[in-house]
C-alpha cells in the first residue's frame, strides 16, 4: 500500500521555506503587474515603486492585524493619496503579492515536469482552444456524457490546509489565513448557486481553488489510469486483478468511510474521459449509463467524505451524447450522426448501404452572443444594429479601429466554429453598428457613409485567417466559401473574451 500511496502524493517533498519575506520585495509586485493585472486601480494613477515598497507593505500588514484596519491617519493619506480612494486597496496589494509567492513552488514543479517530459512549447497547453482538439478526437467515439457543476462553497480553512502540503512557512500561512477570514466577503461575489471571485482579485483565489480541485483530481486520475489493468480477461493475470481490487479497498478504508468501498468494484472501463473548465467538469464514457452512475456516485462520495463539500447526486444528469449539447467556453458542442447512402453492386443484385458516422461539431450560440452585444450597446435585443455613443473628440479612424479590433477578436476566438453563419451575423452587426455610429457623429445618413467608405471598408472586417487564406488560395476564395467551414483552433488564446463569457453574467 505504501508503494501505491505515492500516486496520491503530488510531489510534496519540494516544499519551500521562508516565503514570508518575499512579501516585502518590490519585484514580486512588478511580476504581478506584468501578469495582466494592470486593469487594477493600483496601477492607474501613481507610480508602481511608490505603492509597493517594503515600507508600504509593512504598514498594510500591520493595519490588517489591527482591530480596525480601515482607519488611516491623515499623514498616510497625504503621503499615499491612493489610500483614501479605496478602502480595500491594500487588500488587493497583498492578494497580488500572495498570488505570485504561492505560485513559486508550483511553477518550479511545472518547469521541471515539462523538462523531464521534453515538452518544448508548454505555452500551447495553456490555451483555451487546446481542449477542443481533444474533444474532437475522443468524443466522437463516446456515447454518454454528464455535465457536472463542481461544488464551489469551499471552507477557508480547507484552502489553507491545501497549501500546508506545499509551504512550511508558518508566518505565510498564518497571514494568509487571517487575510482570507478578514476579506472573504469583499473578495467574492455570491451569485445564484455558485460563488464567483470578484474581478478585482481573481488570481489568488483562482489559484487556491485550482490547487484544491487538483487534490481530488489526482485521486480521480489515479483510479482511472489503474483501471486499465482490468481490461484483459486472461486467466494469467486474474490474480493481479484480484490483488488490485484488494488495494483499492484498502485505500478506501484508509482515506474514506467504510461505505465507500462498496462502489469501487466498477472500474472496468478504460474509456472514461474527464474535462474540467471554469467551475464545471464533463464526464464522458463509451459504456452504459450504469457505469456513468457509478462514476457519479464515486465523485459525490469523494467530495463529501474527503473534501467536506456537500453535493446532491440528483443534480448530476446523464445524457446520450448524440442528443445533448454542451455549452462551455463560448461554444455549443455536440456529437451529430452524419448518414450517407452507398450503392453496392454485386452481379445482378444491388444493395443500398446506409453508413452513419459520428462527428463532433462546435457552433457559436447566436442568442447568448446577441444578448452580450445588446448589453454592450452594439445592437438591440432582436439583433438589429444600433449606433453606439462616442466621445466628441474621437476621430473616425479611432472608432473604426475599435470596431475592427472587437470584430477580429471575436472572429479569432470563434474560429473553431463548424458553421460560420452565426459568425457572419456578428460581423454584420458590428460593421453596421460602426457605420451608424459614424453617421450619428457627423449627423448624416447611413447610406451616405456607405458610399463614402466604399467597398474597402467592408474588406477591413475580414478576419486574419480569411485574409491569409485568400492570399494562398485566391481562386478558391473567390469562388467558394467551403474553405472556411472547417474549425480553426488557435493555441495563443489564454482568456475568454468578455462578450462570450455568458456563464458569469
Swiss-Prot record:
Compartment annotation: Plastid, Chloroplast
Keywords: Chloroplast, mRNA processing, Plastid, RNA-binding, tRNA processing
UniProt KW RNA-binding keyword: yes
BP GO annotations: mRNA processing; RNA splicing; tRNA processing
A Gene Ontology molecular function term of the record: RNA binding
GO cellular component, one term: chloroplast
Pfam families (alphabetical): Intron_maturas2, MatK_N
Main localization of the protein described in the UniProt heading: plastid
Function as written in the Swiss-Prot or TrEMBL entry: Usually encoded in the trnK tRNA gene intron. Probably assists in splicing its own and other chloroplast group II introns.
Protein name in the entry: Maturase K
Species, as recorded: Syzygium samarangense
